[in-house]
Amino acid sequence: ADSAGELAGVCPATVVIQTDWFPESEHGGMYEMVGDDYVIDGDNQTTTGSLMASGVDTGVDVQVRAGGPAIGFQNTVAQMYTDTDITLAYADTDSVAFFWEDAPVVQVVTPLDKNPQMLMWDPEVYPNIYTIADLGEADVTVSVFGGGTWTELFIAEGVLSSDQVDPSYDGSPARFIAEGNIAQQGYASAEPWDYKHKFTEFGKDVRLQLVHDAGFEVYKSALAVRADELDEMAPCLERLVPIVQQAQVDFMADPGRTNALIIEGVEAIASFWTYDEGIAAFSVQAMLDLGLVSNGPNGALGDFIDERTNAVLDQRRAAGMDAPAGLSASDMTTNRFIDYNIGLPGGAETAVGLAGVCPATVVIQTDWFPES
C-alpha cells in the first residue's frame, strides 16, 4: 500500500466481496483485509470493517459475504448479476465458462493457485491406491455432491466410470465412516483434519489426491468482476488487486488474528458449519504444504496462466460440456492489475512444487572440481 486512504474516491465506499462458503481459512486473504473495527452480522452472514492494507486504512470499507446457504447455494458468478452491490465475487474457471453467455465475469486475481478439492479414501482399506485414476481402475465407489464439473469430466475422459460415481453426498461423514470402503470428495485443507480429530469414530489419516493433480487445473475461488465493468473498475483494481495479493501473503505468514475473526464469524452465523483453532491452523499449513497457496511460475502470487485456463476450456469442449466456441483465457482472466513483486517469500512455488515429484535429494554430478 502506498499510503493511507489510497482507495478513497477510486473504489466503492464499501468493497463487497462475495465468497463461496461459510467463513474458513481458505478465505483468509479476504478476512485479512478487514480492520479491527469490524462488525459481524450473523443474520446476513457478513463481516464488515475498514479495508486495511497491511495495517494501513485505505479509506474505504470492505464487506466479506458468506456463500453457500447464505445465498441459497446460488453459484457466485450468477450471484454477481442477481446482486449488483457485489464488487468482486469468487469465480471458478469452469463456472466462468458455464455462465459466460448470460453472466460474463473476468477473473482479476487468484489467492489460491491450486484448487483444494480432492478425493480421499482410507489407506488401510486401499493400501495400493494413490491416485484418482487408481480409484477408477479399482472401481471404488466415489461419493460426491451432484453437478460437479470435475466428476463429469473424469467420467468423459475415462478416469472414472459413471456407475462408480454416486452423486448423493450431502456433506455428512456418516457413510464414509460406516462403509469404510468408499472414496469421498472434500477439501484437502479441511476434511483430513476433521476425519482424524473431529470424527473420533474414524480418527485416523486419510489418503487423498487433489483434483488439480489428477488433471483438472481450474482456478478455484479467484476474484472476478462483471466483464462490462472491468475498464470502469480499472482505477480501483490497479490499487486493490496488489492489496489482495499482499493480504494473502500476510495471512499465510501470520494467520492467528484473522483465523480468530473467521471463527467468530462462523459462531455468529450459528449454522451447521463449525470451525475452531485446530482446523484453522491445519488449513493454513495444508495450503502451504500442498501448494494450494503458492507463487505461480512468474514468481507472483495471484496471476493466471493462459495455458491452464485454455486447457480447462478444451477439456470441457472435448467432454461435450458448455464452453462458448470462441471463448479463451484472454476473455476470462487478466493479469493487468497484478503486482509481480508480491509473492510468498523464498520462492514458495519451487519448494512446494518439487516435493513428492522429485527425489528427496536431487543429486547433480558435475565434470570437475567446483569452479565458476
Regions found by a protein language model. Name each.
Residues A1-D2:
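N-terminal Sec signal peptide cleavage junction
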Residues G5-Y169, I182, G186, Q209, ...:
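Short, glycine-/small- and polar/acidic-enriched structural segments
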Residues E24, I71, V144-G148, Q185-S189, ...:
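Soluble non-cytosolic domains of exported or imported proteins
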Residues Y38-D57, L210-F216, D231, G291-D303:
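Short, solvent-exposed loop/beta-turn-alpha elements that line the ligand-binding surface or hinge
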Residues D94, Y169-F272:
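Pocket-lining segment of extracytoplasmic ligand-binding domains
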Residues L160-V165, G203-L208, A268-A286, D322-M332:
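Short, surface-exposed acidic
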Residues E232-G320:
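Secondary-structure end/capping motifs
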Residues D306-V362:
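Conserved C-terminal helix/tail region of periplasmic/extracytoplasmic solute-binding proteins
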